[in-house]
Amino acid sequence: MFLKRWFIRALHRLQKGPGYGYSELFVWYCNNTNTHGPKRLIIEGPKKKTLWSLFTVTFACLVFWQWGLLIQTYLSWGVSVSLSVGFRGMDFPAVTVCNVNPFKYSKVKPLLKELDELVDILLEQFYSYSTNGTLPVVFPDMRSSYLTGDPPPWYQIPLVMIDETDADNPTVTNVLGTDALSPTNNSTTNSSTEARRYKVAFHLCNTNGTDCFYKNFSSSLEAVKEWYTLQYIDIISKLPLSQKVEMGYSGKDFILTCLFGGEACNYDNFTQFYHSSYGNCYVFNWGLDGNVLIVSNPGVGFGLQLALDVNQEEYIPFLTTRAGARFLLHTQNTFPFVETMGTYALVGTVTSVGILVDEVQRMGQPYGTCTTDGLDVPIDNLYSQYNLSYTMQSCLWSCFQIQMVNSCGCAYYLYPLPEGATYCNNQNNSDWAYCYYLLQDSKDHKNECLQTCIQTCNELQFRISTSMADWPSESSEDWIFHVLSYERDDSTNITMKRDGVLKLNLYFKEFNYRVITESVATNVVWLLSNLGGQFGFWMGGSVLCIIEFGEVFIDCIWIAVIRFVKWYKNRKERQVQAQYADPPPTVSELVEGYTNQGFQPDIINSCSPQAQPPDLYLPTTLEIPGTPPPKYDSLRVHPIDTEHHSDSEDL
């Protein structure tokens, strides 16, 4: 009941309003506020009032300006980065090692025989053109291979030479086309006296040939290698996985010796997987079974020591132009992107790799964009088929592969295959190279992937420092190679060469790690503190002053509402009065209007014999009766009976 009465009184106060105008409200506020300055506006003289008005308005504007900047800074959701150093036993990273040569040439040579012969012809073409400006006639056995019947697969990616000796009239020659079978029209005389300027390019077109472009290369070496790689991909993509694994390097042939923390290990301690670029690769301490090796001391003796045999004699000549191994340090249960993030190890040397660990902790929404498991990223992670964790790199390559399938109708060989898609080849996808290079150079597609893929919230980053020395030394070369040869194939003779082996040492350089942590830079406490600081500095105010101002603001609103209601009522009353232009009737006119003659008594001689009863059905000219006037005795006024009162007094 008490609560009900309180609400009723509050409602009456709200309906009644402040009870004064704006000027009275302003005077009341200046007299009662705790803010410095407003009181001077009503107690000082005219000049000081003007001066203090200027001060108050200026400082109030400064306060609001500073408040706007502070709120804008708070809503930017900024973060601060802190760096701390810790000491503990650390998980040894996963180590992936690959031979830069994917397959043994002795096993893959039958598949590449025709392609290798064609590359020999290409090199002869380039040499002849650069010296005398002519293209030699192709060998007769190769002539029939692409002039009769259907064109060979490599014809889908034409290799052309652009002669820029005459800058105003450059000539384009298809090296493998019909115009390549005879010398060009360029004279040999000019070429002998003037060096020929030409460049090699791909002439790529869509399926119907309506859109074409040239992909230029800085040298014929890069052009031939790139062209050979595309043809190699076309051949290898058709082979089953088991055959590709069988053509690669086995763990027994590749890994000669292994030590971890002073304990012996071998290729059985590595996990083998097939890499599209490097063939069979081997991962140490991948952690797929949940077991991760921990190191408690820094130094070479507590790390991983490997001796690898890359066997250069089995290198594919036109595909692999570098010799050595490629290794990558990464976290457990993540895919090793060796081709983009790996490091080379040189043959005939020992490469020592010191490892430093950085632990990065990022903040999520609204302070940043990161993901814990990648499930909130709107891209299918194609590397999840390996049961591996999400990484930024896996998202980028998955995004590119999905765009490749959507744009070109087939998948690129170096990345995992999406469900329902097939790898590109020259027979079924004649314009796949044209589509691939357009997609690769498209900034829109790159930006789309960069904007869609986000980093993980918690990540380990490995920083490495490398140093190298010759291995083995000349004095120890003989006995080391004897021992390694015997351990590998029980041979008493030396079957290894310096240009085919290398040693790799990986260890923690320092037994500490850095933690890079993002934290909130502007929280609510920071915002309120700075808002109050600015208000107090410029106007000497506090939170209570803001409440006072809010009270005055509400009163101003109610004054405006009440005035509007009064104005609206007065307007309605004026509209009602305007409908009656004549003066209002008097009381006598109203009474006369309510008098009906039909109810007045008629003077009829009922005793007269001639009197007849009225015919109720005859039409009458009398008006329709209205409402009769009141004739109640209680409403009649009688004169005062003075005599009666006097008599009663006498009694």
From Swiss-Prot:
Residues 633-651 have a biased composition (Basic and acidic residues). The keyword Phosphoprotein does not apply. Its main location: membrane. GO terms for biological process: sodium ion transmembrane transport. InterPro entries: ENaC, ENaC_chordates, ENaC_CS. The chain crosses the membrane at residues 51-71, 542-562. Originally identified and characterized by its inhibition by the diuretic drug amiloride. Component of the heterotrimeric epithelial sodium channel (ENaC) composed of an alpha/SCNN1A, a beta/SCNN1B and a gamma/SCNN1G subunit. NCBIfam families: ENaC. This is Epithelial sodium channel subunit beta.
